[in-house]
Amino acid sequence: MANPKAKMSKSRRDKRRAQFNARTKPATTVNCPNCGEPTLPHRACRHCGHYRGRCVVNKLAKS
């Protein structure tokens, strides 16, 4: 069985793992059926506040 020769510090470990995350694909986007703006899937639209046909974030109250 392979064993580490020396303890790997948290920063060195995280630097190694960051290389994998940097190479991942860019996030996919879908168009909002309500306003047509590009948005992330399975999340409320940042432009109009709709998700799955319902208004879940009232944009008028925030402004």
Swiss-Prot record:
NCBIfam families: rpmF_bact
Listed InterPro entries: Ribosomal_bL32, Ribosomal_bL32_bact, Ribosomal_zn-bd
Name under which the protein is recorded: Large ribosomal subunit protein bL32
Biased amino acid composition, Basic residues: 7-18
Alphabetically ordered keywords of this record: Ribonucleoprotein, Ribosomal protein
Gene Ontology, cellular component aspect: large ribosomal subunit
UniProt similarity note: Belongs to the bacterial ribosomal protein bL32 family.
GO annotation (BP), single: translation
Region of interest (Disordered), ranges: 1-27
Single GO MF descriptor: structural constituent of ribosome
Lineage: Bacteria, Pseudomonadati, Chlorobiota, Chlorobiia, Chlorobiales
PANTHER family the UniProt entry points to: 50S RIBOSOMAL PROTEIN L32, LARGE RIBOSOMAL SUBUNIT PROTEIN BL32
Protein species of origin: Pelodictyon phaeoclathratiforme (strain DSM 5477 / BU-1)
Pfam families, per the entry: Ribosomal_L32p (PF01783)
Superkingdom, natural source: Bacteria
